[in-house]
Regions:
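Residue(s) in the substrate-gating loop at a strand-loop-helix junction
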Residues: 148
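Short, small/polar-rich loop/turn modules that mediate ligand/substrate recognition or access, typified
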Residues: 92, 180, 185, 243-245
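Active-site helix of classical SDR
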Residues: 126, 164, 172
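Short C-terminal tail/terminal secondary-structure segment
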Residues: 2-5, 153, 233, 244-257
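Conserved glycine-rich cofactor-binding loop
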Residues: 19-20
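Alpha-helical segment proximal to the catalytic Tyr-Lys
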Residues: 131, 177-181, 241
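Substrate-binding pocket helix/loop in short-chain dehydrogenase/reductase
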Residues: 102-103, 107-115, 213
Length: 257
């Protein structure tokens, strides 16, 4: 991790989907930079473990419940983060879900759930956070949305996920234009294949081509969650002050050729 332990002193950060994988890595990165972090997810036991893992870091990590599929829960999580720290500087929209299914097998409920978690939750968290981010101390907060390489290309057996992640990219651009004349910054990370707990439990549907699913691993293999978290933290930092409306692909060069 970065040796700059004061990069986010006095800054408050809300990270969604923070109980494992990329979200947990982002919490640790921000805490290492001195941030006040509100880690939000459904699994409170895992969140407690993430917070405990940050105990020796200079930041302050609190945690609470969030179900991004529920707009009211999104509003409550933002209010809780502001209540804990008095203000909000950064929102990291990381929560998501991904199941592989052949398109003819996707039910209406599965489609609705994927869109609710992967796209609507991003919108409702941003909607609740923006009024606070516009009043962030020091002049403007920022949002980092986590999409996927499936937000810029197609991904097999992932119709709902791909549609939602393309939506996150579009939402990022829409918000960036809407707040072009304000101090608020909005950017998006599109990670490729990461070595997270989820990747070790991939359920390949019957009739699927496993090689198509594993294309995201690229020639250099899976990235660590911490590598991608470093990109999130950079975009949220003052060092990225000129970056607004950007779609940052982080994929070991997979989409380069």
């Amino acid at each position: 991790m970065s040796s700059d332990s004061h990069r986010f002193d006095a800054k408050s950060v809300l990270v969604t989907g923070a109980s494992s994988g990329l979200g947990a890595a982002a919490v640790r990165r921000f805490a290492a930079g001195g941030a006040m972090v509100y880690a939000a997810a459904r699994d409170q036991e895992r969140l407690a473990e993430v917070a405990a893992s940050c105990a020796e870091l200079p930041g302050d990590v609190r945690f609470g419940h969030l179900d991004v599929a529920d707009p009211a829960s999104c509003r409550e999580a933002v209010a809780a983060a502001v209540g804990e720290f008095g203000h909000l500087d950064v929102l990291v929209n990381n929560a998501g879900r991904h199941d592989f299914r052949l398109t003819p097998d996707v039910t209406e409920a599965q489609w609705a759930q994927d869109i609710a978690v992967n796209l609507s939750g991003v919108f409702f968290c941003a909607q609740a956070a923006i009024p606070h981010l516009l009043e962030a101390p020091g002049g403007g907060g920022n949002i980092v949305n986590v999409a996927s390489v499936a937000g810029v290309v197609g991904e097999a057996y992932s119709a709902a996920y791909t549609a939602a992640k393309h939506g996150v990219v579009g939402l990022t651009k829409a918000l960036a234009v809407e707040y072009l004349r304000s101090p608020l910054r909005v950017n998006c990370i599109c990670p490729g294949g990461m070595d997270t707990p989820q990747v070790h439990t991939i359920d390949v549907p019957d009739g699927a081509d496993f090689e198509l699913i594993m294309r995201v691993s690229a020639a250099r293999g899976f990235m660590s969650a911490d590598q991608v978290a470093a990109a999130i933290v950079f975009l949220a930092s003052d060092d990225a002050g000129a970056i607004h409306g950007s779609i940052q692909v982080v994929d070991h060069g997979h989409l380069a050729g």
